A protein has these predicted regions:
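Conserved catalytic core of the tyrosine transesterase superfamily
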Residues: 1-305
């Protein structure tokens, strides 16, 4: 497949995240490999809908329908770019390809008991305990993406260099594509962040780092990235006896808890950083029936008569 280098430059110009760009390019490479294995034309002008359908079917059999859906979405972007750039005179083949269907997958939520066990696992007073408690509190309280959480900055006196505003009980979080949003936090989360910041101040050279979350390595400090947060959650999950603890489970759990407590979809969209109603509807599916039954028990019209 041609022009992937040019497409990569266009994606970078459009502000796509490195992770998204890797996914896009991987889909084009997977299609190119499929075409080569099956001795099909791989010229961008000659690739047709039938070949792409065959590729997606093969991906469903080899991996999963969800993986095929990712390739479908990414290839729509690629062939759309080719058309806009005038690099393909033939019609966009993706207009004739249907999105692969996948059975709805119920996302596992973290029960309140599991969240309590995780909090207990880091209830000590060490630097790591203070840090991990604050991280857990924010994840439970906001469902923030791990990339936005890891990217929080901190400065004790310069508002332009910090994303932490505890007096206002809110955080400035960077979203996909470079957008920013203000995420509110509750009193317990704010107190946990404050305890961590005080512990952070006692770490040598902590003031030299622009990042809120620090890891300690020997006598130095380093930025705790999203992979570090993932590793911490796995470790704390093992300590607490809670399996499968990862950032996205907190996001699903937060959305479910928000809606179960009567929170509005519009407010959920703002806090989660979503711009369309598709995402809250997707996240709401998992326990939608259970929430509806719980709401009916609270609001039953018949019980008022």
């Amino acid at each position: 497949m041609a022009l992937t280098g040019s497409w990569k430059l266009a994606l970078e110009e459009g502000g796509k995240s490195p992770k998204t760009i890797v996914s896009y390019l991987a889909s084009v490479k997977a299609l190119a490999d499929f075409l080569a294995r099956n001795r099909l034309p791989d010229d961008t002008e000659l690739v047709g809908a039938q070949a792409i359908r065959a590729f997606l079917v093969a991906e469903i059999e080899r991996t999963s329908a969800v993986s095929a859906q990712v390739h479908y979405r990414n290839l729509r972007v690629y062939f759309g770019w080719l058309a806009r750039e005038g690099e393909r005179e033939a019609a966009n083949p993706m207009q004739l390809v249907d999105k692969p269907s996948a059975p709805p997958k119920v996302k596992p939520f973290l029960a309140d008991d599991d969240l309590g066990k995780l909090m207990k696992a880091c209830s000590g007073t060490s630097f790591e305990d203070r840090r991990d408690t604050a991280l857990l509190r924010i994840l439970i309280d906001t469902g923030v993406r791990v990339s936005g959480l890891a990217g929080l900055r901190y400065h004790s006196s310069d508002d332009s260099l910090t994303d932490v505003f505890l007096s206002q009980r809110r955080l400035r979080v960077r979203l996909k594509g470079g957008r920013e949003t203000w995420v509110p936090v509750g009193a317990k989360s704010a107190a946990a962040i404050d305890r961590y910041i005080r512990a952070r101040a006692r770490i040598p050279r902590a003031a030299d780092s622009p990042w809120l979350w620090l890891g300690t390595r020997g006598r130095g400090v380093d930025h705790m990235t999203d992979s570090g947060i993932r590793a911490m959650l796995k470790r704390r999950g093992n300590e607490a006896g809670v399996q499968g603890v990862h950032p996205h489970r907190f996001r699903h759990t937060f959305a479910d808890n928000w809606l179960a407590q009567g929170g509005s979809v519009d407010d959920l969209m703002h806090i989660a950083g979503w711009t369309t109603y598709d995402m809250p509807l997707l996240y709401a599916k998992g326990r939608g029936i259970a929430r509806a039954h719980e709401a009916h028990q609270r609001l039953s019209p018949g019980d008022r008569i």
